[in-house]
Amino acid sequence: METDTSRTDTDLPFFHPKPTPARPLQGLTILAVEDSRFASEALRLLCLRSGARIRRADCLASAHRHLRTYRPSVAVVDLGLPDGSGLSLIREMNRAAHRVPVVLATSGAEREAAARTALEAGADGFLPKPVDTLAAFQSEILRHLPEDMRPQGPRPLDATVLEPDRLALREDLAHAIALLDRDAPPMGYLRRFL
């Protein structure tokens, strides 16, 4: 993957809000590479409450299109995607001339093994699915951000558990059923997806 842009969204000459204790991710753009609508909705709510903008890619091809256009502040990459492994994208981003500042992997299956494999591929950290609380989401991102991108002073730890829209879960289940109805359903992908 070649990234021909060396700028992050925060390099643009517009006004960029600074992080605050209440909105510690304000001013950041998070690229969520996630095929599950339910998990994407959860990430959207976490970003919204944290002050971050979110862009979504539901597959590797879409993620590559995003990365050719801009460099996000943070990338959250699901390891099991319909058109390949998120590990390959993590490796590509890790080798890029202008690396995304924070790359986190996410998976709901075999968490310890997935985390170890993702870190070996070059991820900075790992977010298990589902993310337990708003504080856990914010803390994992802030832990890996460069000092100059973090909010100054103490910040409240919000233990709020955000509930994504149940309609998104129904859509994910309908998608899985449709895949099972194929002549040759992609069982490996379905195991990771569900």
Question: Where do the language-model regions lie?
Answer:
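Non-catalytic signal-transmission and effector/linker regions of two-component phosphorelay proteins
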Residues: 1-31, 35, 154-160
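Active-site beta3 strand of CheY-like receiver
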Residues: 70-81
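Alpha4 helix (beta4-alpha4-beta5 surface) of REC/receiver domains from two-component response regulators
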Residues: 88, 109-127, 135-139, 143
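Short hydrophobic/Thr-rich beta-strand motif most characteristic of the beta2 strand and flanking loop
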Residues: 51-59, 66
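Short amphipathic alpha-helix used as the core "switch/output" element in two-component signaling
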Residues: 87-99
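Acidic catalytic/metal-coordinating carboxylates
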Residues: 59, 85-88
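C-terminal output/effector regions of signal-responsive regulators
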Residues: 154-194
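Conserved acidic segment of CheY-like receiver
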Residues: 25-38, 43-47, 75
